[in-house]
Structure formats: C-alpha cells, structure tokens
Amino acid sequence: EVDIGAKPAQGGARRVMPDPRSPVGEALMQIQKRDRGFDPNRFLDGAEAAFGMIVEAFARGDRATLKPLLSDEAYAGFDQAIAAREAAGETQRTELRSVEESGIEAAELRGNIAEVTVRLVTDQINLVQARDGSIVSGAEAVTEMTDVWTFQRDVTSSDPSWKLVGSTSA
C-alpha cells in the first residue's frame, strides 16, 4: 500500500517528470481524470517512501511489512528470495542513505487499472553476509543504485493505496 499523500523518505530528490504532451504525460492525465486524488508529484513522494519501506523490510526478511505493499505475484518473488537467503544462513543489510532522483518513466490506464512506472536513483549500503559474517555480495561502501518499479491501483477503489507489481534493477 502506497499512500500517495505520504512524505518522501528522503527529502531533496531531483524529480524527472514527463512532458504533459508526451504519451506518458497524456496517460498521467487520463489517470487524473479517473482518479481526482492522483497527483504525479505526490505519487512520487509515496513511491520514494514505499521504496525505503520495501527494501529495508526485504533486507530484514519482514514478510508482514511486505505483504500489504506488494501484489500477490510480487510478494511471492520477494518471499522466495527471503526463504533462499534464510536457508543459506545469510543475512542482508540495506541502508537507504538518500533518494537522489525519482521520475515517472511510464504510465498506463487499462480499464480501471492504473499502472505507473518510476525510476529511482538511490545511494545505499547493500550487502549480504554469510553465517560467519563474511560478505557474500555487496559492500560496506555507499553505492549508487538504479531501480525501476511499477505500481498499480484500481482507480475505482476507495483505497488510495498503490501496490508494487514489478521491480528491476537498471
């Protein structure tokens, strides 16, 4: 669930918004016509906040936090990755230091279902450690990461929450 009125997890991110005359800009206007509460800037605030909650909950293996934020299909993928990490005796540490840039890359309205894809450039520490504490992957250093996440919402629903339906690292 992403409250589009939420404040950004980290202030000061550079915003990249589509030209209103572009296909993405036109799709955002179609979403706004069907969902009067939709505002692209507030949506990005919520997406940034959700990103922080989701990556940190994933690192902790906090399934209870993840479940309401993700579609069933996305949750199944995250759950499988957490289970594999647990089975291997590994732990993940993720510290989101800042959101440097966020932008809307794609938008679509299919029937009552709105989908908005965002690109997030963040600075984070991300590492996986074995039982003995040795680093399996990642590093203690702050690394710039780029992620592309797609959120979805039924615009006829009284629930203003958006769910993560897809994620990739760019």
Tell me the role of every PLM-derived stretch.
Residues 7-96:
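Core segments of small alpha/beta cavity-forming domains
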